[in-house]
């Protein structure tokens, strides 16, 4: 079967309507911030335990030291809580700048420390912050789809994740989540049921260093997204449903 080079999403990817680059910076890992992140992880684990029946596969694949780019599919609002609850460290989070307009999220993000990004725009400050994080040996988590899926399955990837991995020469760690749709979890909670959720950590891989130019970047993005698709059940593969066929 022929493989499409650039799968398309059902609707155009969002572009940030605001431009506040002064807010984009790499969080400083002070002692107090490390403590806040630890407390936040404990809180996330409590929420996950109460609201879901989470099954975790492949945690041994997660790198314990050294820089890495963690890529996840994005089904719903609970994804960040689930990922931060199960991962053994406190990765840097790349988040859309619009989240700062929600007071509660702004408070949490400022305490944890988030690298803000302006989607659909050449955000050099976000790139610089991410590359500095890698130089310091930190791990970064990002959703390469660029938004929460509007179809309930994998959408086409944007090139940001591939660019960062290639630029920094760091491994990509694929993490997939199923069952985290907000509506599904909300409906089960109303019935006093915990929602079954599955997370899978795949083996880290290095993108081809020969990838150059826009075509090479798109190819690297395709590799990332197809790797995520192969970790997902067929119903969640979306525009990458052709993999393994």
Predicted stretch roles:
Residues 30-52, 106, 110-113:
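Short hydrophobic helices that act as membrane-entry/anchoring signals
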Residues 56, 93, 114-116, 172, ...:
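Conserved beta-strand scaffold positions in the cores of enzyme catalytic domains, especially
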Residues 51-53, 90, 111, 137, ...:
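A generic structural signal for alpha->beta connector loops
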